[in-house]
Amino acid sequence: MMVSFNINSIKEYFPNLEINKIQVNNEGWDHEVVIVNNNLVFRFPKTEHIRDKMVVEECLLKNLKRIITQISLPNYKVIKNDKGVPVFGSYKYLNGKPISSIKYKETLKSDTNAKAIADFLSALHSLDYYPLKKLGLDCTYNREYWMELYNKIEGTLFKYLTQWQKEDIRYLFDNFFNNNLYTHYKSGVIHGDLTDSNILIEKSKVTGIIDFTDTQIFDPAFDFAGFYWDLGPEFTEKILKFYHGKENIDNLYYRVKHFYGIQPIFHEMLHHLEHVENFNIQDFMEKYNNYRCM
């Protein structure tokens, strides 16, 4: 029903658009995505909270596109109703496929890709965020967010874990909450969800970055978490060699290695517990154990 409603909305706001082919992706947490004619992408927010973020995303991308040329970004436009309320967002389809769809990723870990990613992050993290704050950009990943995550882990996952694993996770979070390196940093605009699903590749070259829904003002180290977890520490270090940030790289990498680059596993396990039957939690913990021993 919602798919039909959204397609009707596209027809209402784009009456001259001839629709020959439609692809729908409803798997994301934030948007239903409709791709028309392999050419136009329409993103419909699933909640009011996500709807409120659309104008910030539009403004951010407009500013970023002025200074980033190596990597393609969505030419994002928010479509509003006659009362000025955002209905959906649209942009021209970007070529490439997400890294997550590629089985063998070693060819992606080139100096060229590392530099392209580093240049993108250097530009993003150096943006003046005060104009975006006026539009509503804030910090979601605050202390309360991480406390809530830990409580969920303790209440939901601990019963499946060994005593050593539980103690190590407690130590991981205790260090995060009490180590000054996690509070004394220079905040910047971050992407907030820079995983292998949101980085586009074509012919083994990074060509685009999408989905800025989780953009916020936070620790720039967080944006390296996906690379660390999905593509490994070595490639993350390679990116950092080309990165120009506001602080000491060793301090930033410490935060990636000892918390941000590890925490994606908890979201994965919680998601699987809720949505996947008969999965082995120790299969996930094997990778966790390996990363913690590095």
Region spans (language model):
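Short, surface-exposed alpha-helical segments at coil->helix boundaries
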Residues: 3-7, 58, 237-240
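An alpha-helical support segment within catalytic cores of ATP-dependent transferases
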Residues: 3-17, 109, 114-115, 126-192, ...
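Short glycine/proline-enriched coil/turn segments at helix->beta-strand junctions
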Residues: 18-19, 36-40, 69, 203-204, ...
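ATP-binding pocket architecture of kinase catalytic cores
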Residues: 21-144, 184
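Helix-rich C-terminal or lid/interface subdomains of diverse kinases
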Residues: 29, 115-116, 214, 225-294
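Active-site acidic catalytic loop and adjacent metal/ATP-binding pocket
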Residues: 32-35, 42, 171-222
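Short beta-strand segments
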Residues: 43-45, 77-78, 189-192, 209-210, ...
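Short helix-capping segments at alpha-helix termini
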Residues: 66-70, 164, 246-249
